Amino acid sequence: MKLNPVLNKYTNAPLSLSLKRLQECSARSFELASPAPPEINHSVDFYNHEQNRIFNQEWICIGRCDEIPTAGDFLTHDIAGTSVLIVRQESNAIMGFINACAHRFTCLTSEKLGHAFAFTCPNHAWTYGINGQLNHAPFMEMKSSFNKNDNNLERLHTEVWEGFIYVTLSKNPKKGIAESLEMLSKNIVGQYDMTDYKTIIRESMNWNANWKNLIENFTESYHVPIAHPKTFANHKKRIQDYECGEDSEHYCYHFAPQESENGPGAAHKDNKNLKGKWRRTMVDFCIFPNHLVTLMPDYLWWVSVMPKGVGEFKATWGVAVPQDILNDIAEEDHDNWVMEKIEYMNTANEEDRELVERLHQGSQSIRLPKGAYHPIEKNLWQFMKYLTKITA
């Protein structure tokens, strides 16, 4: 569904009004709560504010460690208009840099994934090692005050958690991502051993909606039996069995077991980590602000959502599977098997796209009812409380 950008009564809502409305909504208990105010999904002032408070400051997931397994492997990602470059080092560490030459700030590479022994600026051939140090700057000896050591790439803070790579544009992040997510790992997702999952797909998509519309769609499974008849509904999880996790400033999650203990959605027979109901349980979680994961015993699907405007976002997504699942796929069948996974996920994405774009369209209406939450939509309320605090 293609939506044309439109001006509505919320477009020019002043930041003060959006913040006030958000504060009022999030102050209510979950039992009395209503959905987030439409201003925060349509106001240009609020959009600019969240770019500064959220995407220029918070930890952002940009991919998986196994996507860059070898020294010199790299990936790039755009965060709020800033291109970042993530490179595997000789030491096996992962380092992050601003993807801009230290001379006059030309982007060093436009490749999304690649391998390099050095990065050479296409403008004036300044050349950097994979550690970001300037190795060569043609004819700069003509300037007596020039010092190569003062002209390295701008370094970024990076961290790895459960096989995911996170980066922040903040010079002084308040808290590390691993520390923030310690209890989520310990109590819920650590038992799945996500570091053992191997990436088989990395794609991206652009949708015509506010980025928060997708966060809300992903963090509730109330819609799944109705909206996903060709995909996720087939796992047959009962709405009554969903449980929402504890309140946290850093994440939210919900989980439910599927009906079958075998086949798609269930653990491989060689999986020794998962016990009891967890061998057939899905966990949907969001690492605030924009990292979404559906975690199952036989695969995970991750999404990193990046706004491109009030009514448009880009979502980078990938699929990874445990090694024991891969071991059962014959080499000659691998490509067809991956294509089937891509087709399945594309179908699921299309099922969601119309919902998300309709949500954005409907919420710009000049008159709206109060709205309400279903009991298994608590994650939306938790996300709203995070937004309230981070944008205050």
Regions found by a protein language model. Give the residues of each.
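Rieske [2Fe-2S] iron-sulfur-binding domain
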Residues: E67-K171, K175-E182
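N-terminal short leaders/motifs
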Residues: L15-V44, T106-P122, E154-V160, F232-G265
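Short, flexible segments with low predicted structural confidence
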Residues: S18-S26, G129-I130, L184-N187, G276-K277
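Short Pro/Gly-enriched beta-strand edge/turn motifs at strand-loop
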Residues: N56-I68, A137-E141, F285-P289
